[in-house]
Swiss-Prot record:
GO terms for molecular function: ATP binding; dTMP kinase activity. Phosphorylation of dTMP to form dTDP in both de novo and salvage pathways of dTTP synthesis. The gene is tmk. The lineage of its organism: Bacteria, Pseudomonadati, Pseudomonadota, Gammaproteobacteria, Lysobacterales. Signal peptide: none annotated. This is Thymidylate kinase. Transmembrane segments: none annotated. InterPro entries: P-loop_NTPase, Thymidylate_kin-like_dom, Thymidylate_kinase. GO terms for cellular component: cytosol. GO terms for biological process: dTDP biosynthetic process; dTTP biosynthetic process; dUDP biosynthetic process. The keyword Transferase applies.
Length: 208
């Protein structure tokens, strides 16, 4: 099962990914948390670009796709194949939103990611840019060149407009516990179908 957590910077993706994984592991489900960009060589290049603005949008797309292909081949597909729940802190919709906000065609970006497995659940944590930026400052970070009100507004609009069948929007202006409860309810819907009789046992544990 593949769960992707998306949203603009400061939406609470990393917090939710960790909390959700703890819940699922607590009921005996093998759960892996990963992120994009990854910590691999391509991902490190992307982080350097995010800090310095060195790459053009087209160059970033090329490196993002290289990073994602390696991620899919080395972790996502193998872990799903063994029955684990994979939780991703960002996935291909982030590339579509951020590079789309930089002026690249959204349809072409989606097509370039056709190789990437589609999430069973895509949790879009929605917050206004002002709140996202406030949270970035509160955690002691300095916003990078992507993290401006104007750019995050464009990214948010693209995230909300994306037509992906598994997308579910969560109001992430709420506290972390409320967001986790909403996310868990959506994940449980898929688990109920995926796990059958075993799912009933797991769901009772999660509900407890």
């Amino acid at each position: 099962m593949l769960v992707a957590i998306e949203g603009i910077d400061g939406a609470g993706k990393t917090t939710l990914a960790r909390s959700l994984a703890l819940k699922l592991r607590g009921v005996g489900l093998e759960t892996v948390v990963s992120k994009e960009p990854t910590n691999g060589p391509w991902g490190m290049l992307l982080r350097q670009s995010a800090a310095t603005g060195r790459f053009s949008p087209e160059e970033e797309v090329d490196v993002l796709l290289r990073d994602r292909r390696q991620h899919v081949e080395d972790l996502i597909v193998p872990m799903i194949g063994r029955g684990a729940v994979v939780i991703l802190d960002r996935y291909f919709p982030s590339m579509v939103a951020y590079q789309g906000a930089a002026g690249l065609p959204v349809d072409a970006l989606l097509e370039a990611n056709a190789f990437a497995p589609r999430p069973d659940v895509l949790l879009l944590l929605d917050v206004p840019p002002a709140i996202g930026l406030q949270r970035i400052w509160e955690r002691g970070s300095t916003p990078n060149h992507f993290e401006t009100t104007e750019n995050l507004s464009r990214c948010r609009d693209i995230f909300l407009a994306l037509e992906l069948p598994s997308k579910r929007v969560i109001d992430a202006t709420a506290n972390a516990e409320t967001v986790l409860s909403a996310a868990l309810a959506l994940v449980m819907e898929v688990l109920r179908v995926r796990l059958g009789a075993l799912g009933a046992v797991v769901l009772r544990r999660l509900a407890g």
